[in-house]
Amino acid sequence: MSLCIGSHISFSSKDGICKSVESDLSLDCYQLYISNPKAFSSTEYKESDLLSFRKSGKKLFVHASLIYNLCGSKEGEDCPKYKRNLEFTRRGLAHDLDVCALMGARGLVVHVGAARDREWGCQKVAETVNFVLKERSKLTDRYSEILGKDIRKERTLLLENCAGEGTKLGRDIPELFKIWSLIERKEQVGFCVDTCHGFASGSMDFGKTKGIDSFWREWEEHFPKESLRLFHLNDSKGILGCKVDRHETLLCGRIWENKPEVLAHFLEGAKGREIPLVLERKDNTVEKELEICRALVE
């Protein structure tokens, strides 16, 4: 059993997914956006490119648009933009899930959204998840025809925890569990835990071995082990409980600075459970970070 670690990579629709991945052969797994993460738009893809990637067998995770809000609006159903935003999010997620399924991606990672009324928000997130896993479109029918089976059964959605900022949902394990408990097709829904987010929220102290052990205990008390499908491996610029989402290079932030042995303890836990890890910072230290992580768990 070896550590499965990679990073977020840039993707050009002109080059195609296969070429984008081939340029980063040192990675065990990959994450990318398949459309503009901050715009109301979707990208069309060559079916041949998606199928070529599927045949490659590479471990790919796709990150959904950052402007999706599975609640529709943080202001609730009385907000004038609620219906439009909810429809956009649901339509976009269903489209992205079909693209991911055709290319054989391991999951679509999504920030769950925000709501002032957290109880209502958790219910609305679950409603949206239940909706998009069943939703059918012309694209669904086309891709199902290509694969010779209902592609909706291959949709996999990964809900990501937040840093606890303002009205954002998914700030701790109990809140994630509240959402998950309302989801119908649990076998098609997993989680992505961002270490910076968990630390910044104050609910996951990855900076101490005891905190890491506590995280695993709490997680496995709430969820089946296979529900945690991915880690976003990021250090944090902010202190524990700062409620600020600012990633930092590994061993240079408030989680693991001068604490390689604690990072090693965390990595061993992920390795033993066969959970892939993706680095998200876009700087020139990624290769060095990969080298350090692999050396720590040799």
Locate the predicted segments by residue.
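Hydrophobic faces of well-ordered beta-strands that scaffold small-molecule active sites
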Residues: 3-9, 28-32, 60-64, 108-110, ...
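Acidic (Asp/Glu)-rich catalytic clusters
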Residues: 19-26, 44-62, 94-104, 130-152, ...
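Active-site beta-loop-alpha junctions enriched in small/polar residues
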Residues: 8-12, 33-37, 65-67, 113-115, ...
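Gly/Pro-rich active-site loop or hairpin
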Residues: 80-86, 119, 169-173, 177, ...
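N-terminal pre-domain/capping segments
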Residues: 1-95
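C-terminal helical cap(s) of enzyme catalytic domains, especially alpha/beta-barrels
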Residues: 286-298
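Aromatic/hydrophobic pocket-lining residues that form the small-molecule binding cavity
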Residues: 15-18, 89, 93, 122-125, ...
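Active-site acidic/histidine proton-transfer and metal-coordination neighborhood
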Residues: 69-190
